[in-house]
Regions:
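Rieske [2Fe-2S] iron-sulfur-binding subdomain
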Residues: 1-266
Length: 266
């Protein structure tokens, strides 16, 4: 629902029938979505929760295998450090070659956008659930209405937390076991620079390089524009005037495009 126009569209929504494979255990659970994504185009998707913090989706076809591998490690109440990988294993050499030449920071732009689709919802809903637990003395199943098969894995994970893991992470002695106040600033919740970029070698280096290139492009664009104007004023060859004008325009557009990439890293 939250990933509208990022990995799907709400108007294309269909029932997601998730099933447990076996019982919930101290070590986690496994499940299957028999139809799988894209209305069954790629076959069944398998899910594994390996306690306490690993979630893995696996989708296998004749052409490729793709995995979503996520570790979510609680750091303080209301915060987790997320470590995610999205491996693709191709039977053909051409897709493998393509994925190797795509810079890691480029793929991070899209992956972070998908994570941020959930950020505001999770931040606020966590406090609603905490209020139901502390003030209303409700369990998670009482506080949340989850009538569909799409809720199967969430329900199983919450039962693992409540029945097996003691209800919450084991925080270090002396740590305040309370959620911090709700953040009302959208910019603070979606602060990609401090949440990811400054800690990611690929993204931080790319951001620095893009900033330097933009400065150089600004100089080139201005010089080309001035040269084009001077050539026109001196009635030089129209080809010279047009050539420098084109250089000025192209470098300005490149600078604008790179500026958009830098903004996405902030």
């Amino acid at each position: 629902f939250t990933h509208h126009n990022s990995v799907g569209k709400r108007e294309n929504a269909t029932p997601v029938v998730l099933e447990m494979e076996g019982e919930l255990k101290p070590g986690g659970f496994t499940g299957i979505w028999k139809e799988g994504p894209r209305s069954g185009k790629y076959g069944s998707q398998f899910t594994e929760f390996s306690a306490p913090s690993l979630m893995r989706h696996t989708l296998r076809t004749e052409q490729f295998t793709t995995l979503t591998v996520v570790y979510a490690v609680p750091t303080t109440p209301g915060r987790c450090r997320l470590m995610a990988r999205f491996p693709f294993i191709f039977s053909s050499a051409l897709p493998r070659m393509f994925f190797k030449i795509v810079p890691r920071w480029w793929s991070h732009l899209n992956q972070n956008a998908i994570l941020e689709d959930d950020q505001i919802f999770l931040h606020k809903q966590e406090r609603v659930i905490e209020n139901a637990k502390v003030v209303k003395k409700q369990s998670y199943s009482q506080a949340c209405y989850m009538p569909t098969k799409a809720d199967t894995y969430v329900s199983a994970f919450r039962r693992w937390i409540a029945d097996i893991a003691g209800g919450s992470p084991s925080w270090p002695e002396g740590m305040v076991d309370q959620l911090p106040p709700q953040t009302v600033s959208r910019n603070q919740l979606l602060d990609r620079f401090h949440a990811h970029t400054e800690n990611c070698k690929s993204c931080s280096v790319a951001m620095g390089n893009l900033t330097k290139i933009r400065k150089a492009l600004r100089v080139v664009s201005l010089v080309a524009l001035v040269t084009s104007a001077a050539a026109f004023a001196k009635s030089l060859s129209p080809k010279v005037t047009v050539a420098f004008a084109v250089v000025a325009a192209v470098t300005a557009m490149l600078r604008e495009f790179m500026g958009g990439l830098v903004q996405k890293m902030k």
